[in-house]
A protein has these predicted regions:
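An intracellular "coupling" helix at the cytosolic face of ABC transporter transmembrane type-1 domains
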Residues: 10-13, 99-103, 119-128, 132, ...
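Conserved catalytic Walker-motif region of ABC-type ATPase nucleotide-binding domains
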Residues: 97, 219, 307, 351-353
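Transmembrane helices of ABC transporter permease
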Residues: 11, 15-28, 130-185, 257-268
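Membrane-integrated ABC transporters
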Residues: 1-33, 37, 45-60, 74-78, ...
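Juxtamembrane helix-loop junctions of ABC transporter transmembrane domains
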Residues: 21-22, 26-42, 63-110, 114, ...
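Helix-loop-helix
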Residues: 49-52, 148-162, 232-314
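ABC-type nucleotide-binding domain
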Residues: 325-604
Length: 604
């Protein structure tokens, strides 16, 4: 918590000083008020002197007006500081999240990151605001009230000596049991957010499979688990106020009884008894508020630790790394070579014994993948579900780092590239075409915000999207709903491909990006990418369709994370058992088997 305050509180340093300082002045007024009231009772009311009552009343009114002005200053400082620090924290968190690697994002989880950015920052904001407004006020008011009461009459001050330890014991007991539960509450809240996110994100799938009841059951289970822990914490916290007020009221009763005896004996005045009761009430109420502050700060401390966990997580890829000079990179001896790769000294892609395992997985997603791809060539990647196609693409794009082996891009290790240069050189179109709320123009300009209209229309023409965009009333300025829900699946895919082409990337990676296109549009798109895109454009096309990859210069066949075939369509159809099975399942004609050696043996 203190580290976050040091990190984000510097721009608001003077407000962090002025706010609590004004509260100290307010505490002085609060401590003087019972004394003024006591003088009013003893000198004015008891003596029946209205002028004295009016004089002290004006003093109290002046103190009240001054207190209001002081409170306004403090509230202003607290609001600006808390909101400003919260905004800065969210901005820094979001910036850091966008720099994390995909593996780090997987470890945190989307739901957890959302909760940290929204809920945890809110908890810290609340703690900062209360720290400015209350952290100085209540402890000083409690101590000041105790001192003032002892000064009035030390014998009655012994009542404080009994009441304060009782309140402290209740406070310590409740905190000891509730503090460990706060982190559990946050973890349960993460689970609720995850279930809600999955249910809303997959609403169409849920309805298609009539799984509404199951999803409701999942949400109820997660909500109940959160509610049980939150209720337990709430019950413990709820004990504080009643227990404290019980002790306080018993103390007031003791003061009134003892004060009456002392007044009869002439040891105290009526005004002093009233002042003593006020100080007793202020002191014990201050302890109640301090207890509530501790609850808030404990929650905020847990939230601050979760925020710091993200902020202190160094990205696995160094964004400020210097890309080394262009140099030829030799592939591993014996690695499979795409035809034509040896003709170029610096291939566009070079994988050497690459393996990868997802965190928590028992088996590797990819094992010992090696090949080279010349610049300007097209590589098709095909395989069954779960064979590792998308994982291979993400490794080649630098989105994940291999567990072992090396990935070189245009002659340089992927992890040595500057992050911005890498993203300019490589464009990835993921399986799920994601469009953002705005316009078609704003979505297309993600890679190049200054791209002229000619470049945008050129990308749309290549992606076979220009025709339907021109038909829209506003053309490039046509609105796009969140997620692109006002476009069909095929239109979203074509717009996503057009967005990737803007900025002239050197390497285009398509992850099953033809799946929503009809055969004619797919063929036209492949033709345009092969001949109409800026040259030289290297392509990696991941697909489950043979038609999408059969014209590629080379096709990589994956099976259970292993490279079991590499070659042209005709070569694989004649030699690779897995590829032949895929072709047969899609009713693609294949030539007679020329070799009985399966591609699994080739890879081994």
């Amino acid at each position: 918590m203190l580290d976050l305050l040091k990190r984000f509180g510097r721009p608001y340093a003077w407000r962090l000083i002025i706010g609590p300082a004004t509260k100290l002045v307010e505490v002085v007024f609060d401590l003087l008020t019972p004394l003024v009231v006591a003088r009013m009772i003893d000198e004015g009311v008891a003596s029946r002197r209205p002028d004295v009552v009016v004089r002290y009343g004006l003093v109290l009114a002046g103190m009240a007006v001054a207190g209001i002005l002081i409170v306004l200053i403090c509230q202003k400082c607290a609001s600006v500081t808390a909101q400003g620090m919260g905004t800065d924290m969210r901005r820094e968190l979001y910036r850091r999240v966008n720099r994390l690697s995909f593996a780090q994002l997987d470890r945190f989880g989307t739901a957890s990151l959302s909760t940290r950015i929204i809920n945890d920052v809110n908890q810290v904001q609340l703690a900062v605001a209360l720290a400015i407004r209350q952290l100085i006020r209540w402890p000083f008011l409690a101590v000041g009230s105790l001192i003032a009461a002892v000064v009035i009459d030390w014998r009655m001050g012994l009542i404080f000596a009994v009441c304060l330890p009782l309140v402290g014991a209740v406070f310590a007991l409740v905190m000891a049991k509730s503090v460990p539960l706060f982190k559990t509450v946050q973890a349960k809240l993460d689970r609720v957010a995850q279930v809600v996110r999955e249910g809303l994100g997959g609403a169409r799938v849920v309805r298609a499979f009539v799984r509404e009841r199951n999803e409701r059951a999942r949400l109820v289970e997660a909500s109940d688990a959160h509610a049980r822990v939150a209720t337990a914490v709430g019950r413990l916290s709820a004990v504080l106020n009643p227990a404290t007020f019980l002790v306080m009221n018993l103390g007031v009763c003791a003061i009134l009884w003892s004060g009456a005896v002392r007044v009869d004996a002439g040891g105290l005045t009526q005004g002093q008894v009233v002042a003593f009761v006020n100080y007793m009430t202020q002191a014990l109420l201050s302890i109640v508020y301090v207890a509530n502050l501790v609850v808030v700060f404990t929650k905020a401390s847990a939230s601050a630790a979760r925020i710091a966990e993200v902020l202190d997580c160094e990205p696995e890829r160094q964004a400020d790394a210097v890309c080394p000079s262009q140099a030829a990179h030799d592939t591993e001896p014996g690695s499979l070579q795409i035809p034509g790769a040896s003709a170029r000294p610096v291939p566009a892609l070079d994988l050497a014994s690459v393996s990868f395992t997802y965190a928590g997985a028992q088996a590797p997603a990819l094992s010992n993948i090696s090949f080279s791809l010349p610049a300007g060539a097209t590589l098709g990647v095909i395989g069954g579900t779960g064979s590792g196609k998308t994982t291979l693409l993400e490794l080649m794009a630098g989105l994940y780092e291999p567990a072992c082996g090396e990935v070189h891009l245009f002659g340089n290790p992927v992890d040595a590239w500057d992050e911005a240069d890498l993203r300019r050189a490589v464009a990835v179109v993921p399986q799920r075409s994601v469009l953002f709320a705005g316009t078609i123009r704003s979505n297309l300009c993600w890679r190049d915000p200054a791209a002229p209209d000619e470049a945008l229309w050129g990308a749309l023409d290549t992606a076979q999207a220009a025709e339907f965009v021109r038909a829209l009333p506003k053309g490039l300025d046509a609105p796009v709903a969140a997620g692109g829900t006002n476009f069909s699946g095929g239109q979203r895919q074509r717009l996503a491909i057009a967005r990737a082409l803007v900025g002239s990337p050197r390497l285009l990676m398509l992850d099953d990006s033809y799946s929503a296109l009809d055969v004619r549009t797919e063929a036209a798109l492949r033709q345009a990418l092969a001949h109409g895109a800026p040259a030289p454009l290297t392509q990696v096309v991941v697909s489950q369709r043979v038609s999408a990859v059969r014209n590629a210069q080379a096709i990589a066949v994956l099976d259970h994370g292993r490279l079991v075939g590499l070659g042209t369509h005709n070569e694989l159809a004649a030699t690779c058992e897995v590829y032949r099975e895929i072709c047969t399942s899609q009713q693609v004609s294949v030539p007679p088997v020329l070799s009985h050696a399966a591609c699994r043996e080739v890879a081994e």
